[in-house]
Amino acid sequence: MSITKEQILEAVSEMSVMNVVELISAMEKKFGVSANMSVNTNNNSEKSTIEEKTEFDIFLKSIGPNKVSVIKSVRSATGLGLKEAKDLVESAPTVLKENMSKNDAESLKKTLEDAGAEIEIK
């Protein structure tokens, strides 16, 4: 035998306010939900836009065992001179390059990881 929604509503309408509050609390615990959840009642066809990140920074976390190879890769990627590239690599952890496209950042990350560096894209 199943109880209908109408029967439940009738039973709840006959309860005191305190009993209804206790019932809601018990239902929240039993079903793991909150009665305070917000409901979007806006009828506009407004869509929330999720901004996709378009610029990325290459962050050198560590040099790894092959320092010379990493310096060469950094030098070719950044256009820095040998001394500047060496100083930059030795200052790890540091940002190597900023405001790159996703494809360029992924490509540079692969190149530097192949050289032995530990890289993070932020």
Swiss-Prot record:
Molecular function GO terms recorded: mRNA binding; structural constituent of ribosome
Pfam families attached to this UniProt entry: Ribosomal_L12, Ribosomal_L12_N
UniProt-listed GO biological process terms: translation
Statement: the UniProt record of this protein carries the keyword Ribosomal protein: yes
Assigned GO CC terms: cytosolic large ribosomal subunit
CDD domains given in the database record: Ribosomal_L7_L12
Keywords on record: Ribonucleoprotein, Ribosomal protein
Keyword Ribosomal protein included in the entry's annotation: yes
Known partners and oligomeric status: Homodimer. Part of the ribosomal stalk of the 50S ribosomal subunit. Forms a multimeric L10(L12)X complex, where L10 forms an elongated spine to which 2 to 4 L12 dimers bind in a sequential fashion. Binds GTP-bound translation factors.
Function: Forms part of the ribosomal stalk which helps the ribosome interact with GTP-bound translation factors. Is thus essential for accurate translation.
PANTHER family per record: 39S RIBOSOMAL PROTEIN L12 (PTHR45987), LARGE RIBOSOMAL SUBUNIT PROTEIN BL12M (PTHR45987:SF4)
UniProt record similarity statement: Belongs to the bacterial ribosomal protein bL12 family.
Protein name as annotated: Large ribosomal subunit protein bL12
